[in-house]
């Protein structure tokens, strides 16, 4: 009885303490969704903020050089200024992806897997085809139905010519 009480007292306290320690393990940084954010979209070509928010010393010097006439900037500096403002160009945004290969491959995988399951079922689950599906059996059954004159007004036997022993045209 005493060990049970000690275990229950220390066990519940240890469990609750470990939960508290686990809960305070990391600090979650919350995003302020009221502030504008950067996004590359074709239908929204000029985002509210620049792509690079924290400029390095070289980028700050380049931004100062940007205030001068643009003819003095080299092509590489113009590209660097563009990359500070935007992550992708329109050509890069419009470039096709290879996602279709993944979709087609996944679809073909599942079609193949389904085919394997059907082949396995046909081989191991289903029995042999009943003898009533044989062409000879179907012919005998049709002859029997014609001999019995099944549905003679508008049905099966109405389409059979009993004098010529052939189907009516």
Curated annotation (Swiss-Prot):
Under the cellular component aspect of Gene Ontology, which terms does the record hold? Answer: mitochondrial inner membrane; respiratory chain complex IV
> In Gene Ontology terms, what is a biological process of this protein?
mitochondrial electron transport, cytochrome c to oxygen
Q: Pull the Mitochondrial intermembrane topological domain ranges from the record.
A: 125-169
Q: Where in the cell is it found?
A: Mitochondrion inner membrane
Pathway(s) annotated for this protein in UniProt: Energy metabolism; oxidative phosphorylation
> Which Pfam families does this one have?
COX4
In the record, N6-acetyllysine modifications are located at 29, 53, 60, 67
Where is this chain primarily localised?
Answer: mitochondrion
Q: Which residues lie on this side of the membrane: Mitochondrial matrix?
A: 23-98
Membrane topology type? Single-pass membrane protein
Bilayer-crossing residues are 99-124
Q: Which residues carry this modification: Phosphoserine?
A: 56
Keyword set, alphabetical order:
Acetylation, Membrane, Mitochondrion, Mitochondrion inner membrane, Phosphoprotein, Transit peptide, Transmembrane, Transmembrane helix
From what superkingdom does this record's organism come?
Eukaryota
Task: Please give the family membership noted in the entry.
Answer: Belongs to the cytochrome c oxidase IV family.
Q: What does this protein do?
A: Component of the cytochrome c oxidase, the last enzyme in the mitochondrial electron transport chain which drives oxidative phosphorylation. The respiratory chain contains 3 multisubunit complexes succinate dehydrogenase (complex II, CII), ubiquinol-cytochrome c oxidoreductase (cytochrome b-c1 complex, complex III, CIII) and cytochrome c oxidase (complex IV, CIV), that cooperate to transfer electrons derived from NADH and succinate to molecular oxygen, creating an electrochemical gradient over the inner membrane that drives transmembrane transport and the ATP synthase.
Tell me which PANTHER family the record gives: CYTOCHROME C OXIDASE SUBUNIT 4 ISOFORM 1, MITOCHONDRIAL (PTHR10707:SF12), CYTOCHROME C OXIDASE SUBUNIT IV (PTHR10707)
State the name under which the record lists this protein: Cytochrome c oxidase subunit 4 isoform 1, mitochondrial
Q: Which organism is it from?
A: Oryctolagus cuniculus (Rabbit)
Kindly list the organism's lineage. Eukaryota, Metazoa, Chordata, Craniata, Vertebrata
